[in-house]
Amino acid sequence: MERGPNVRSLALISPTGLSKDAQERQPNEGLHKALSFPLWSQAFFDLLATRVSIRRFLNMSFQGEPDERLVDYSYKTAHQPGARFAPLAFVSGKLNSPDIRESIYEQLQHPVLVLYDEDPYTGFEALPGLMERHPNWQAKRIVPTRGLPHFDQPEQTFQALDAFWNEPPSDESES
C-alpha cells in the first residue's frame, strides 16, 4: 500500500486472513517463548527439520505427493544459518497478521486476484464478502490443490495469472 503507484495489481496465492475466525487468532507469545527456550529449541527444530517431518508437512499441502526436489530444497533451506527461528515463529503464530483483513485487504484499491482451493492451514469463508464489498477483487479456485496450487496445478495457476495480468486496467484502478 505504501508503494501503491508502483503496483498495478496483486495476486495472492492461498492467502491467510480470510477464514471466518482469522481475526481472533493472535500470536501466542507464551508458546513462542517456550519453544524458543535455548535448552530445547534446537532439539525441537531438529525434529521439525528432518526429511520425514518436511515430507509430512508438504503432504498436507499437496493433492498428490510432493516432488522430491522440493523436499530436498526445503531440507537444505531449513539448514541455513538462522533458519531454526522461522518454524518456531510459524508454530507459535508469530508469522500471522491477525488484523490483515482490515488493515491490508480491505484497503487495497488495485485489482486483486486470489487463487485458492482447499488449504489445511487456512480457510476462505470471508472471501465472498470481501469480493462483494470490493469489485476490484476476484477469485479463481484452482482444483484440485491443497495450498500450493503453483506446484500442484502449475498450468491452471499460470493461466489464471496470465489472464489476470493481461486484463486491461479498469477506470477505477487507474485513478
Please place each PLM-identified region on the residue numbering.
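Flexible "cap/lid" loop of the alpha/beta hydrolase fold
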Residues: 7-41
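Short aromatic-enriched loop/helix-cap "lid" or pocket-rim segments at secondary-structure transitions
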Residues: 21-26, 126-128, 152-154
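A short, basic/aromatic alpha-helical/loop segment that forms part
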Residues: 19, 121-122, 148-152
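Active-site catalytic pocket residues across diverse enzymes, especially alpha/beta-hydrolases
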Residues: 3-4
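Catalytic active-site module of serine/aspartate enzymes centered on a nucleophile-bearing elbow/loop
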Residues: 135-175
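Conserved loop-alpha-helix segment in the C-terminal half of the alpha/beta-hydrolase fold
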Residues: 107-145
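Conserved alpha/beta-hydrolase catalytic His-Asp/Glu region
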Residues: 21-25, 45-106
